[in-house]
Amino acid sequence: MVSQNAPFSLMYDAWKAGSRALLPLDENTAREQVKEMCAKVLSNRKPPYSLKGGLYDALVATGGDMFLATNEEAMEAGALFEKLEGIDIEPAAAVALASLMQCVREGRVEKDAVIMLNITGGGIGRYKKEFNPMRQKPDLVFPVNPDPEMVKTKVRELIGK
């Protein structure tokens, strides 16, 4: 099972269309969609989906499926996890949990099924409230489609080689 956070649904759209190739998505539209989603770490515009041995192949080989969760569904799932487990989770984990909850509601999970769900970021929200960490600016920011040679040069400069 792989989950994406609506409205950024690049892999989900390709999977549901039965396409190994990602469907075209305008860069400006993609940027706007990423701004709207709560789990920004799930916004890879060039994910390892289409390549041989990538997510498409893994889902086909395992009979898997792709799911989509809204921000609201993710927030509800995250709040439920915190209420029941006593710890906050990151938005990406909440998206995965929302997708699992969707599967349960739809009867796609057997009653006695053994489930492993990777929950990340437990306690980060609490930590931020208690310690108020300062956000650092990146030393290096690349354009959307950088020249590979420019990337090599900039990284070498950054690490001093």
Annotated model-derived regions:
Residues 2-88, 132-161:
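Active-site/ligand-binding loops adjacent to catalytic centers
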Residues 1-2, 117:
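Structural beta-sheet core signal
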Residues 97-160:
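Catalytic phosphate/nucleotide-handling subdomain of diverse soluble enzymes
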Residues 84-93, 108-114:
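Short, structured secondary-structure boundary patches
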Residues 1, 10-11, 92-100:
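Short glycine/serine/threonine-rich phosphate/pyrophosphate-binding segments
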